[in-house]
Amino acid sequence: MSRAATTRMGLLEVRARRAVAGKGARLLRAKREVLASELWKLVHDVLEGRARLDEALHRAVKALELAKALEGEERLASLALPAARAVPLAVTVRRVWGVPTPSVAAPPLVRAADQRGSSPVSWGPSGAAAARHHEESLEVLLTIASKELHLARLGEEIQETSRRINALEQLVLPALRSEASRIAAALDERDREDAVRLRRFRARHPRPA
């Protein structure tokens, strides 16, 4: 930080910069509190979502194993090919205290039996159940993915905000306080010297009676 002029205007400038830096630190702390509150809500949601995903995947795997045993892998593979599809995803961005956080949305993924590319009668009950459970798992996964992206972005922003707060409180503000003290001390010393010179001048040049 460059030194300010050792003048009263310089002192006023440094004090103004210190006030701005202090206000900035307070605003950043308020921002961090809001982001942290949002983050903790998301942590709870993500943990719940992961538990739901574990359950959904467990059901899907069990259903697939049963379908393989009852209908055979080759038959399931032949049904899976026409059932394949691209899933259109919509990514939107919302802002929390100016922080862009992505959100992923998709249309309903669980399909009726006649929407999987084959005649419904081609699907046995176990194969249809396996397909449905996997589609349900994908829906849960996409929901969690959106929250995980949001969580990661908030975490990054909280870290960056903390670094900025630390820089202001540990570097900028102490430096400005020190600079203000230096200028104030120099001005006081200058005032004392001026007062001494004035007394000497008056002593040498007394006013005529």
From Swiss-Prot:
GO biological process: proton motive force-driven plasma membrane ATP synthesis
Functional note: Produces ATP from ADP in the presence of a proton gradient across the membrane.
Record-given protein name: V-type ATP synthase subunit D
Keywords: ATP synthesis, Hydrogen ion transport, Ion transport, Transport
GO molecular function: ATP binding; proton-transporting ATP synthase activity, rotational mechanism; proton-transporting ATPase activity, rotational mechanism
Source domain of life: Bacteria
Family (UniProt): Belongs to the V-ATPase D subunit family.
UniProt keyword annotation of Lyase present: no
Designated gene of the protein: atpD
Keyword Ion transport: yes
